[in-house]
């Protein structure tokens, strides 16, 4: 089976090089850190899934509707990295596994406090093989506006051929090279050491952990942070794993022209007129709808992605690709060349990790993806200071043993308020799983008519349970009578489940 590339923790997704068979051993890599673990990450037979708004990896696609021009060169930074030397460093305070945005963000902030940090990754300077799309205000709040290479003043949602919504919220694409360089420079200046290798295992002793690397080196550390994305090979889960799946097929392309306003990104296009001449595709789309997500960079360069918001099991890639081909034909988009092709997957929902446990997680490995949307980039970067502060504080306490330290980090990362919030988001995912195309259109018609504070907060994980309950009532009040009846009929079982789970939560 072909390898599956698991983007680093800040990216909520998995970019698959081919379909994934259940029950077979899977090979994963986080940014660069590879793991082989057949007892974890399993997907329904014949399905693969996509990463966040714009994860990319150059892969073979079984159905490509045009001639493809690929740039196979893998970009890398060229810093003179300070290397970990086991002859002079007997032990470090923190080992970060994975050099993705989340891992580097924590490494940078922990090292600012004088804590010794080693970051392990087979290609620590490699540019991340995924693009990130974010709301501009999310990056502005973290002083990262200089790390956006393209922004759109607003976005648009097409519900059908007659109705669309304009979203007055700027959207941006992350400059991957700039963001990584900024984080790497901070790490280097703070004295973070780097070790180029794969992590094979972590062995826990009473007062430290041993990180076993592929080159034979074993590094002793007080704390281990798993920032490897969705590999789930270092962080433990107990409950059965049965998430929803967000699937997508997309590419950056040079085109003769396209019909979209270059000042607006296309957040969702639920129109289905392009399928009217194919009864099978139309019937399938009616049941399990997909939408177009597009970033127009200019009049003849654009990112196009056909996306299944959430399904269980995921919509097969071949089906998604066929719908994309029909959509492009209908929109009269003639693709001249393709720069990047991506087949991507996001597991959404599912159980939280075992808490506490010795290995600390962040991002995908800590189940931080938004269960209703698939978003995670800004949420994870915003959580990095929380994780870093907890680690620094507990390391500074002479009374802190490794398990109590990790327990504190997990508790700060997943306080009861965040757990309750996630439970509501899982309820939202369950409702979306039950809707067909027409129900989905009615849902988003009501959703984007809410006050900006509410839908902004929902998408950006800024609302907590009391506000989310008001959000739910407002959404129900905004909905049409048909949508209300549908929500009551299909949303009652997941609502009961959410209430039961909330009532059983303990702080």
Regions found by a protein language model. Give the residues of each.
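N-terminal chloroplast transit peptides
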Residues: 1-57, 61-62
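N-terminal FAD cofactor-binding segment of flavoenzymes
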Residues: 105-162, 178
């Amino acid at each position: 089976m072909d390898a599956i590339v698991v983007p680093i923790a800040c990216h909520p997704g998995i970019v698959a090089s081919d379909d994934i068979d259940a029950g077979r051993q899977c090979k994963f890599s986080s940014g660069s850190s590879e793991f082989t673990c057949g007892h974890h990450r399993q997907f329904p037979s014949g399905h693969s899934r996509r990463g966040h708004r714009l994860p990319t990896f150059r892969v073979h696609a079984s159905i490509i509707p045009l001639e493809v021009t690929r740039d196979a060169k893998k970009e890398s930074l060229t810093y003179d990295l300070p290397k970990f030397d086991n002859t002079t460093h007997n032990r470090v305070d923190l080992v970060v596994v994975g050099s993705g945005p989340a891992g580097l963000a924590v490494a940078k902030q922990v090292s600012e406090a004088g804590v010794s940090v080693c970051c392990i990754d087979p290609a620590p300077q490699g540019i991340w093989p995924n693009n990130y799309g974010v709301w501009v205000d999310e990056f502005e709040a973290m002083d990262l506006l200089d790390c956006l290479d393209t922004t759109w003043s607003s976005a648009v949602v097409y519900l059908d051929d007659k109705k669309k919504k304009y979203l007055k919220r700027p959207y941006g694409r992350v400059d991957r090279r700039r963001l990584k360089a900024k984080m790497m420079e901070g790490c280097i200046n703070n004295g973070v050491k780097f070790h180029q290798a794969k992590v094979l295992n972590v062995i826990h002793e009473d007062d430290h952990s041993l990180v076993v690397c592929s080159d034979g080196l074993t590094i002793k550390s007080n704390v281990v942070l798993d920032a490897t994305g969705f590999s789930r090979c270092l962080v433990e889960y107990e409950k059965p794993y049965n998430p929803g799946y967000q699937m997508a097929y997309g590419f950056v392309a040079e085109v003769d022209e396209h019909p979209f306003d270059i000042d607006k990104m296309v957040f969702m296009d639920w129109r289905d007129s392009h399928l009217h001449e194919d009864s099978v595709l139309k019937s399938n789309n009616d049941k399990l709808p997909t939408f177009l997500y597009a970033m127009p960079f200019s009049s003849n360069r654009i990112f196009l992605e056909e996306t299944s918001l959430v399904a269980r099991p995921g919509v097969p890639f071949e089906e998604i690709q066929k719908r994309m081909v029909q959509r492009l034909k209908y929109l009269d988009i003639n693709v001249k060349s393709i720069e990047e092709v991506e087949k991507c997957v996001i597991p959404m929902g599912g159980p939280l990790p075992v808490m506490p446990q010795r290995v600390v997680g962040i991002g995908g490995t800590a189940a931080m993806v938004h269960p209703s949307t698939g978003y995670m980039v800004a949420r994870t970067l915003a959580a990095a200071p929380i994780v870093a502060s907890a680690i620094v504080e507990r390391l500074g306490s002479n009374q802190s043993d490794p398990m109590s330290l990790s327990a504190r980090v997990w508790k700060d990362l997943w306080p009861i308020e965040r757990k309750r919030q996630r439970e509501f988001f899982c309820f939202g995912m369950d409702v979306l799983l039950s809707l067909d195309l027409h129900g989905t259109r009615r849902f988003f018609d009501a959703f984007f008519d809410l006050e900006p504070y509410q839908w902004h907060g929902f998408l950006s994980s800024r609302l907590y349970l009391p506000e989310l309950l008001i959000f739910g009532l407002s959404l129900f009040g905004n909905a049409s009578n048909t949508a209300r009846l549908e929500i009551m009929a299909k949303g009652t079982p997941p609502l009961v489940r959410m209430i039961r789970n909330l009532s059983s939560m303990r702080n």
